[in-house]
């Protein structure tokens, strides 16, 4: 592989210095920007970072052998990281959009057989090949929007056979697509129709059958639960998360999205890597998360699409908890792949600064999927995952919403998007 020399960026936003822990409080505003910055890449890794003058001198005898990427007038950031998605699914749910506009709530639609249950039916019925192709198209769109690593949850199978099918497709995508796919088992996404009269029985199936099988096959790193009234209680969620820990699956939790339900407190209790949503989390729950180092993954696109009040990122940041942002890409409550849009919503709806929003989709998002040591910032030794945005500064990326500013994407030192087009 030829060396890659990315030269003369208007802004090189490195976010250097937080590979061992996420950024918190005022540190989220410290982006460590290099004007007229350049990056030298060797064998898929970042080998040097500095001004163009510094690197041109350092590598003057090797520039002729390198592939040159001219970043003049552009902003270079770490590859974006999406730490919470449900992008491996079949079907679509645009009919529910009209239902919600007529006044139906998320839980009303779900209890009527729509929502997660509708996507479960479509995903169960889809062949593995169909599921792969539909999901690959979404993954291509993530890449075109600057995402180089994405978390993918199961949870639209809700049986051993179909959960394994979803996770197998996610693994195949990780192996065949430039974007790294980090898998989360979420058999506890909903209680399927066949278990609606015996939810505790379904919990036993998750604990005694699904988790052991997923662990045996090596299909996931994390274990997630939708802890909400009418879905899984805190007691049921605790059982599922502790069972996952026993099999080496790190806990995550969908917490306090619809009402304060003790999800944030439970996340702190079980040592979750992250607690996600948190629209209605209690102050005490947030305090405990901050104390235990649980990352708050906030999903403003979901609140926007469901027309509800978003989580209070300002309060969570000021409380000392690390904050990441994510699309929550899914067919029912956030059908988007655009992290730049999510950054804009994080500022407008959640009280974040633009710098905090960018940190939340790079280094903090990387820590939310246990990858902060290898991605999320532009530092020597890390993966050469980089994005060139066709804007002169990072503020424009967030301010000028509604269009895709991605020009070039580098994944593991290889150009995979050029002039806004896939080239892998």
Curated annotation (Swiss-Prot):
The catalytic activity of this protein is classed by the Enzyme Commission as: 3.5.2.7
Q: Any keyword Cytoplasm?
A: yes
Indicate the enzyme's highest-level EC class: hydrolase
Query: Gene3D superfamilies, per this entry?
Result: Metal-dependent hydrolases, Urease, subunit C, domain 1
Q: Which residues bind Fe(3+)?
A: 84, 86, 254, 328
GO MF = imidazolonepropionase activity; iron ion binding; zinc ion binding
The free-text note explaining how the cofactor binds reads: Binds 1 zinc or iron ion per subunit.
Record NCBIfam families:
hutI
The similarity annotation says: Belongs to the metallo-dependent hydrolases superfamily. HutI family.
Entry function = Catalyzes the hydrolytic cleavage of the carbon-nitrogen bond in imidazolone-5-propanoate to yield N-formimidoyl-L-glutamate. It is the third step in the universal histidine degradation pathway.
Which protein are we looking at?
Answer: Imidazolonepropionase
């Amino acid at each position: 592989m030829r060396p890659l020399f990315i030269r003369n960026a208007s802004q090189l936003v490195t976010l250097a210095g937080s590979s061992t822990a996420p950024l918190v409080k005022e540190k989220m505003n410290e982006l460590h920007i290099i004007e007229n910055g350049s990056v030298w890449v060797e064998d898929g890794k970042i080998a040097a970072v500095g001004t163009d003058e510094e690197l041109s001198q350092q590598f003057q005898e090797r520039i002729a052998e390198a592939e040159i990427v001219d970043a003049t007038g552009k902003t270079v950031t770490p590859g974006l990281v999406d730490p919470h998605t449900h992008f491996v699914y079949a079907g679509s749910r645009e009919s529910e959009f009209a239902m919600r506009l007529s006044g139906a709530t998320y839980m009303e639609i779900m209890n009527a057989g729509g929502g997660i249950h509708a996507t479960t039916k479509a995903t169960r019925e889809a062949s593995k090949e169909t599921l792969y192709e539909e999901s690959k198209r979404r993954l291509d769109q993530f890449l075109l929007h600057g995402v180089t690593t994405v978390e993918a949850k199961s949870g639209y199978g809700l049986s051993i056979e179909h959960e394994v099918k979803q996770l197998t497709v996610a693994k195949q995508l990780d192996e065949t697509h430039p974007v790294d796919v980090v898998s989360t088992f979420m058999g506890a996404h909903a209680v399927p129709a066949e278990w609606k009269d015996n939810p505790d029985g379904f919990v036993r199936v998750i604990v005694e059958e699904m988790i052991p099988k997923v662990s045996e096959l090596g299909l996931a790193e994390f274990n997630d639960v939708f802890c909400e009234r009418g879905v899984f209680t805190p007691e049921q969620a605790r059982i599922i998360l502790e069972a996952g820990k026993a099999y080496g699956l790190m806990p995550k939790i969908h917490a306090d999205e619809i009402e304060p339900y003790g999800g944030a407190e439970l996340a702190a209790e079980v040592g979750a890597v992250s607690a996600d949503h948190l629209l209605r989390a209690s102050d005490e729950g947030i305090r405990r998360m901050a104390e235990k180092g649980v990352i708050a993954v906030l999903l403003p696109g979901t609140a926007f699409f469901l027309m509800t009040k978003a989580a209070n990122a300002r309060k969570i940041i000021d409380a000392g908890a690390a904050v990441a942002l994510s699309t929550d890409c899914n067919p029912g409550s956030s059908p988007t792949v655009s992290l730049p849009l999510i950054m804009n919503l994080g500022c407008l709806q959640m009280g974040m600064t633009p710098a905090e929003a960018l940190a939340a989709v790079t280094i903090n998002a990387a820590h939310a999927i246990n990858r902060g040591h290898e991605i999320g910032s532009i530092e020597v030794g890390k993966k050469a995952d980089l994005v060139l945005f066709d804007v002169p500064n990072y503020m424009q990326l967030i301010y000028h919403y509604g269009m895709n500013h991605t020009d070039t994407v580098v994944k593991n030192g290889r150009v995979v998007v050029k002039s806004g087009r896939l080239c892998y």
